[in-house]
Design a protein with these regions (language model features):
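Cation-handling catalytic/transport regions enriched in His/Asp/Glu
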Residues: 1-234
């Protein structure tokens, strides 16, 4: 509460963060693996750790969910549908630009931590410039030295692993698509997700768990659709 004794309010971004972290919590709380080293998130491959957390974020964009959990502080009215529709439109604004930017970061990371050997005509900056020439929509000015401060892949733990951000989005979107097909609040599908993804933790390969849940290999279609990047067929 603030100095006027008004309750603290959550923005929509706050709710997304809450659902995201709750997804990690569910991964731990709903494990059935007794070995601590493989229970919950433990021993799950780096590029699948974010599957449950990013999966939960999808519920923050569902009308049936937001309608029942939102209230105006003064009128107690739920979120108006027209405002929700505007939120969806804003969510997908320039989604393609953000998509290719993440691809730029991931490809650069792989190049640097793969076969890269510095030498004449082969600097870190030149590697980044080459990647940008292939995928970037807007090329930064020549003085830009983003690579010098790309802490995720140098000072952080994402060396040769930055791609995991986007791959986890593929997995989580495709997993959520199963709920869209069955009903986003389907108890049966929730039980299946628990049994095949959350309960097993790191006791088996994440891709094997995904196949067990979805019945097939991961597909990118749901991620593109969720980002408004699929063409409407007349």
């Amino acid at each position: 509460v603030d100095g006027r004794q008004q309750p603290a309010l959550l923005s929509h971004d706050d709710v997304i963060t809450l659902f995201h972290e709750f997804g990690h919590g569910l991964h731990h709380m709903l494990t059935r693996v007794e070995d601590r080293q493989a229970s919950g998130i433990n021993a799950v491959e780096w590029d699948a750790v974010e599957l449950p957390s990013q999966f939960m974020e999808n519920y923050c964009w569902e009308w049936d969910v937001l309608f029942h959990m939102t209230r105006h502080i003064d009128t107690c009215q739920p979120l108006p549908r027209e405002l929700f529709d505007k939120m969806i439109a804003a969510k997908n604004f320039q989604a393609g630009m953000m998509f290719v930017r993440q691809l730029e970061f991931a490809l650069f990371d792989m190049e640097i931590h793969g076969d890269f050997i510095p030498g004449p005509g082969r600097s870190v900056q030149q590697v980044l410039d080459q990647v940008r020439s292939e995928v970037a929509v807007s090329i930064p000015p020549a003085f830009n030295r983003f690579a010098n401060s790309f802490s995720h892949i140098f000072a952080g733990g994402y060396a040769a692993g930055y791609y995991s951000y986007k791959w986890a989005e593929v997995l989580s979107a495709d997993a959520y698509a199963a709920f869209e097909e069955a009903g986003v609040l389907s108890p049966a599908m929730g039980k299946r997700f628990w049994d095949e993804i959350l309960a097993v933790g790191g006791s088996r390969p994440a891709l094997e768990s995904f196949r067990a849940f979805r019945g097939r290999e991961p597909e990118i279609d749901a991620l593109l659709r969720h980002n408004g990047m699929t063409a409407e067929v007349a």
